[in-house]
Amino acid sequence: MDEYAVVDGRGTMTVFETYIKTTPERLWEAITDSELRAKYSFGVQTESDYTNGSSYKSSVPGVIDIAEGENLEVDPPRRLVQSFTALWSDDVKSVGSSRVTWEIEPVGSSCRLRVIHDQLPDAANSELYGGWMMILSGLKTLLETGQLLDTPGSLRYARPGQVA
């Protein structure tokens, strides 16, 4: 299986899975800390208090709104389930809400991270889920090496000093 495997990309679900040399607590922090997340997620900051039923908003402040939704299930450092409404273009806005689930499982001295993007319409444009590979590659690189990964997405909204 490839490092990032699309386990099921048919119909209304896309699943990505990777193994990262880190602890569940550090991985949870990288997913939920706005400044840390911006380092591997195209400069996008996500603001939330990460409690069950709370809202979140993702954006590149002063540049573009990316997504918003609700934290449906918050179980640190194991599982985060969120509704996901994309905001970055009229095409993705018209799709409505989908769901993103982050599952963290310790495996020896590493973690398995599984990201499930589901409840997508059958005709969902890959623009909705096509960035996950770059985001997860950046997350893995940051946690394992402390370095930032240059990807087309990370360079798009990078601020000076944000990309190594």
Indicate where each model-derived feature is located.
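Hydrophobic ligand-binding cavity/cleft-lining segments
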Residues: M1-E47, A164
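Beta-strand/loop substructures that line and gate deep hydrophobic ligand-binding cavities in soluble
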Residues: M13, S89-M134, L139-T141
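Short beta-edge strand/loop motif at the mouth of beta-sheet-based domains
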Residues: V15-F16, S34-E70, P77-R79, T151-Q162
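Hydrophobic/aromatic beta-strand elements that line small-molecule binding cavities or substrate pockets
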Residues: E17-T18, E68-E73, S98-E105
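A short, structured loop/turn motif at beta-sheet edges
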Residues: P24-E25, L72-R79, E103-R112
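Hydrophobic pocket/interface hotspot
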Residues: L27-W28, R37, Y56, N71, ...
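Surface-exposed helix-capping loop/turn segments at secondary-structure junctions
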Residues: T141-T151
